[in-house]
Design a protein with these regions (language model features):
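A general boundary/transition motif marking the beginning of the first structured unit of a protein
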Residues: 1, 85, 103-104, 252, ...
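Short, charged/small-residue-rich alpha-helical element at the C-terminal edge
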Residues: 224-298
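Alpha-helix N-cap/helix-start and coil->helix boundary motif
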Residues: 10, 68, 91, 191, ...
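ABC transporter nucleotide-binding domain
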Residues: 171-256
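Residues that scaffold the ATP/ADP-binding catalytic core of kinase and kinase-like folds
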Residues: 70, 218, 288, 292
Length: 298
């Protein structure tokens, strides 16, 4: 079941085509990655999903149909531009934001107490928001996003300003939410977090969706562009190899466009190179990201 369906949306601002025929679907109960370089159209796409912007054409189905006022209370949104009130206490700020989502006061206080303890913020609840560190404010912003227990959570750069310990706290929370059926759409530049957490992704560049699918499918699609080899013999220079990168005792050979891994194996064998290891490299998401973005810009 799809909780979010984006069909051929487009949005222009003056001469700039911010979003251009973007399509993807988000399944219920998954963590979905919305990826792309700065200025790719991610934030505009999110604002179209949430009915902040109207698309020039295309359609959006969210929670089973068009956006309504009732559905807004079933969605949690954490924008990259944070929006906490700075001159009131942390507790007062979060309780006020909870009231906007129609959470009864006693229930809001109970949930808030649990989240403040989980995120090591309980001792700071009476401080003004502006007195908190950026990392603390980031955690508080996340609490405000999920306090009403939304069915769909849309978060933009959830790990910004967080140290490794707090990154793990946020990851554990998001994974717990997924385990309980919450759907999460996450936009981030931290590819290693995407690899660890996301079930599927879409990559947007220059307003277009250029990559879409599960991480396993995408890795298989891009395997074959490089091989990992290990040999005690020196590796010869081959015309079919465009780069040789040392990696933990191995060498990753990046292949030219029309070269197949077996071509390299044969070429090395013909030059009497004794191989201890030869396997097709599985690229990281960082490598795929760079390859696709550079390719779509040429």
């Amino acid at each position: 079941m799809y909780i979010l369906e984006i069909e051929h949306i487009a949005k222009r601002f003056g001469a700039t085509q911010a979003v251009d025929d973007v399509c993807f679907k988000v399944e219920q109960g998954e963590i979905f990655g919305l990826l792309g370089p700065n200025g790719a159209g991610k934030t505009t796409s999110i604002r179209i999903m949430l009915d902040i912007f109207k698309p020039d054409h295309g359609s959006i189905s969210i929670l089973g149909g068009p956006m309504t006022e009732e559905k807004k209370n079933r969605i949690g949104y954490m924008p990259e531009e944070r929006g906490l009130y700075q001159d009131i206490s942390l507790e007062s700020c979060l309780l006020y934001l909870a009231s906007l989502k129609d959470i009864p006061n006693l229930e809001a206080r109970k949930r808030l107490s649990e989240y403040l303890e989980r995120f090591d913020l309980a001792a700071h609840k009476n401080k003004k928001v502006k007195e908190l560190s950026k990392g603390m404010q980031q955690k508080a912003q996340l609490i405000s996003t999920i306090l009403h227990q939304p069915e769909l959570v849309i978060i933009d750069e959830p790990f910004a300003a967080l140290d490794p310990l707090n990154v793990q706290l946020v990851k554990d929370l998001l994974l717990d939410m997924r385990a309980h059926g919450t759907t999460i759409l996450m936009s981030t530049h931290q590819m290693h977090q995407v690899e660890e957490m996301c079930d599927r992704i879409v990559l947007i560049n220059q307003g277009k969706d250029v990559l879409y699918g599960s991480l396993d499918e995408i890795r298989r699609q891009f395997s074959g562009h490089a091989v990992d080899v290990r040999s005690k013999d020196p590796l010869p220079e081959l015309a079919q190899i465009i780069d040789a990168i040392p990696q933990n005792g191995n060498t990753r050979l990046v292949l030219s466009e029309n070269t197949q891994p077996q071509d390299i194996f044969i070429a090395l064998a013909n030059q009497n190179v004794h191989l201890e290891k030869f396997e097709i490299a599985i690229p990281s998401l960082d490598e795929i990201f760079i390859h696709v973005v550079k390719g779509s810009e040429t």
